[in-house]
């Protein structure tokens, strides 16, 4: 038994796995130093996360959960400020737990009646907690922070004190995919908080998230958020009472953002973010050092399986198995099955813990095993040649 174990874990398999992980690291370093020939690969990896596959798998299920804490009210076709003020008051009358208004009322309009009606609503006609939207602007690359903010006219022009949260959507650098949302950002010498963070804290009373996180990785669960038309609020009082209610444009094509679930409205991204914070389901990735350690272990195991099965096939008495072993088809099949099993395990672990392992590097390492074997054979032969030369001289 000891001999078999020693044979299975022979140093050459360890060396092949080590070469594969080194090749993987070299590619990663190529990304970091922006080597031009690796640009296409870099872009592909930058716009890819294993969690995208997990979210897609979850949302393929026919049975989806209906949110019991968040309701959307669609105001896509409402542009009149007086009518918007009425909608806000109607929502307030249904006794929501807290409201989020995903609208920035930019500047005074010629419609003075609409302006005054909205100001009256903001100052006197709302009894429920409300968080109003605003935008952070003028990003300073040198200071790595926003330097200004753009508020609704009743804050900018009249200085009315309201609870606000920024709604800047956060995209990946190249891909433009929205995978996270800011919790807080530094502006001047103080922190500004996002509307999802303020809504979540307003609902739960727990402000831990404000201190613990700068960003919230969004958990795109298989959830349906009830959506009410702006003119059907009273008929859907049960979907508003005690809920977080987000008023915004759910079907405005100008406010669509690309996410792991495809293009969805900005207000729906806010809903997913609030749900993630409230349910404490913020996805986390394994630490980098742990990821690289387990990547090596997984690559080593893959090499042991590939080498062991290929060797057995080549020694088989059956012609077909012998031929399969000769053409190294076993190694390719084992690699595919191994990757599928690894991704499946990662998915199961993520669904149950909200922690995910970046299997992309393992997949790359396993794909490089054949190349690593050839490099190892080349190094071994070169060493043997030099070693034989020394022996002959002696």
Q: Can you annotate each of these PLM segments?
A:
Residues 202-236:
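Substrate-access "cap/lid" subdomains that shape
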């Amino acid at each position: 038994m000891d001999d078999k174990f020693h044979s299975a874990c022979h140093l050459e398999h360890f060396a092949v796995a080590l070469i594969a992980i080194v090749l993987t690291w070299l590619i990663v370093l190529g990304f970091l130093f922006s080597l031009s020939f690796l640009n296409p690969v870099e872009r592909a990896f930058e716009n890819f996360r294993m969690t995208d596959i997990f979210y897609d798998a979850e949302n393929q299920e026919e049975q989806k959960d209906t949110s019991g804490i968040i309701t959307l009210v669609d105001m896509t076709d409402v542009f009149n400020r007086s009518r918007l003020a009425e909608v806000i008051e109607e929502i307030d009358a249904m006794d929501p737990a807290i409201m989020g208004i995903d609208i920035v009322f930019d500047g005074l309009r010629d419609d003075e009646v609409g302006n005054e009606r909205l100001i009256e609503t903001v100052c006197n006609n709302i009894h429920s907690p409300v968080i109003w939207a605003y935008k952070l602007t003028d990003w300073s690359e040198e200071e790595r922070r926003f330097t200004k903010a753009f508020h609704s006219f009743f804050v900018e022009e009249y200085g009315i004190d309201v609870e606000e949260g920024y709604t800047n959507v956060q995209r990946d650098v190249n891909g433009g995919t929205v995978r996270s949302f800011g919790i807080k950002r530094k502006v001047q010498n103080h922190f500004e908080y996002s509307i999802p963070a303020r809504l979540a804290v307003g609902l739960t009373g727990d402000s831990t998230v404000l201190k613990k996180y700068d960003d919230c990785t969004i958990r795109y669960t298989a959830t349906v958020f009830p959506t009410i038309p702006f003119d059907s609020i009273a008929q859907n009082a049960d979907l508003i009472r005690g809920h977080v209610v987000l008023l915004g444009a759910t079907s405005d094509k100008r406010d669509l953002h690309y996410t792991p679930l495809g293009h969805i409205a900005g207000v729906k991204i806010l809903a997913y973010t609030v749900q993630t914070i409230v349910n404490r389901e913020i996805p986390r990735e394994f630490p980098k050092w742990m990821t690289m350690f387990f990547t090596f272990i997984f690559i080593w195991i893959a090499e042991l399986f590939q080498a062991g099965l290929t060797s057995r096939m080549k020694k088989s008495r059956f012609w077909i198995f012998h031929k399969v072993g000769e053409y190294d088809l076993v190694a390719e099949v084992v690699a595919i099955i191994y990757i599928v099993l690894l991704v499946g395990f990662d998915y199961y672990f993520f669904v149950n813990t909200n922690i995910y392992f970046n299997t992309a590097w393992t997949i790359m390492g396993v794909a490089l095993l054949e190349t690593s074997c050839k490099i190892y054979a080349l190094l071994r032969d070169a060493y043997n040649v030099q070693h034989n030369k020394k022996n002959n001289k002696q």
